Amino acid sequence: MNLEKGNIERKKHGVHVNEYLQSVSNPNVYAAGDAAATDGLPLTPVASADSHVVASNLLKGNSKKIEYPVIPSAVFTVPKMASVGMSEEEAKNSGRNIKVKQKNISDWFTYKRTNEDFAAFKVLIDEDHDQIVGAHLISNEADELINHFATAIRFGISTKELKQMIFAYPTAASDIAHML
């Protein structure tokens, strides 16, 4: 594309946009997903969220700003891997009082009943605020289970509250309380 001809300024990772996903150099151009230079991760759900912001701003004028709350990600290998929030290194460097809960859970019933060869988790908890700040999972259910951790981080659900939840059993979600 000849972006210069359209007076569209670009950065290393895409079109230089403002908080409305509008080009900073050509107000008639909007960009979303991987085409936009934003803080969003190059993931399909981020591109989808961006597209909703762009559509709203095209139809209603620049009234909706892009926000990137907690964004979970998954790798669809066998077993699946998923993460959300801070890495262990980021959490420890954040100055918070971090507790790391980590375990191979291949022998838990949830995973034995489906003949999984390997399942494990690492959950990072800010002990002073009883908040999850990161979660990293490996299992066949990791892609679904990570969304529960993303919800907890996004809405500040405490580990105490999560432990009180009653989930359907036997499901991967029913194991959350034992991961905290």
UniProtKB/Swiss-Prot annotation:
Keyword Metal-binding tagged: no
Q: Which Pfam families match?
A: Pyr_redox_dim
What sections of the protein cross the membrane? none
Establish whether keyword Calcium is in the entry. Answer: no
Keywords from UniProt, A to Z, are: Plasmid
User: Which protein, by its recorded name, is this?
Assistant: Uncharacterized 19.7 kDa protein in mercuric resistance operon
Q: Which organism is it from?
A: Staphylococcus aureus
